[in-house]
């Protein structure tokens, strides 16, 4: 058995009932991130954190704009192992839309938890967010070029993967890394369209933001 260490605010509470066990830092150093150890039962797909860090001491966050330009894109109907570079183009408009959705989600979650979002104060936590993979189950870029409200049948709106890196803003020290992969949407074989897909993305970002903030504050 690995000796277990608890990590302040990041590990203090579980946000969703599905996450029944308390997240903990193990004595298992990351081979990818120097100084960070593996976190188990985090509520995310993967997580690493610096032992001894108390994220609940941070009363302010500074969320940098979400990046998505280099996200791996898997086309609808293609193998999950297939890497597609630009068949579904990640346009500046899509990038900005994703960034705007994330900014609204993390700001709302932080405000609700009583965290400042202007980056002021002595203890500021910087959050860098990057979309790493997008696998839509319908080509909404193509559908959006068709006049009117296009409808497609799809299992849901696809899936997406994201990475969060948490830094002490003053020192630049990396405190934690979180990676997560989620299905977008919840209805099996539902009618879906570009409007629904956008709503699913907003809901996904809200879920990510709320859970991340709960790990920071321990509330």
Model-derived segments and spans:
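Second-shell loop/turn segments in exported
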Residues: 85-99, 114-116, 191-199
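Surface-exposed short loop/turn segments
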Residues: 108-173, 190-191, 195
């Amino acid at each position: 058995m690995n000796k277990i260490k608890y990590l302040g605010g990041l590990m203090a509470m579980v946000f969703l009932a599905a996450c029944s066990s308390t997240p903990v830092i193990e004595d298992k150093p990351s081979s990818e991130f120097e100084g960070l150890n593996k976190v188990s039962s985090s509520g995310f797909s993967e997580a690493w954190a610096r032992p001894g860090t108390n994220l609940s001491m941070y009363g302010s966050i500074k969320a940098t704009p979400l990046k998505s330009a280099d996200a791996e894109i898997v086309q609808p109907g293609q193998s999950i192992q297939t890497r597609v570079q630009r068949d579904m183009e990640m346009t500046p408009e899509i990038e900005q839309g994703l960034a705007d959705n994330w900014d609204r989600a993390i700001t709302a979650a932080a405000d609700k938890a009583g965290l400042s979002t202007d980056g002021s104060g002595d203890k500021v936590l910087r959050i860098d967010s990057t979309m790493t993979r997008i696998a839509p189950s319908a080509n909404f870029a193509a559908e959006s070029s068709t006049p009117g409200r296009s409808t497609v049948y799809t299992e849901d709106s696809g899936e997406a993967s994201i990475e969060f890196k948490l830094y002490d803003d003053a020192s630049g020290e990396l405190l934690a890394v979180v990676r997560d992969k989620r299905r977008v949407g919840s209805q099996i074989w539902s009618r879906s369209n570009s409007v629904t897909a956008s709503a699913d993305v907003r809901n996904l970002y809200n879920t990510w933001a709320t859970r991340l903030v709960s790990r920071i504050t321990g509330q």
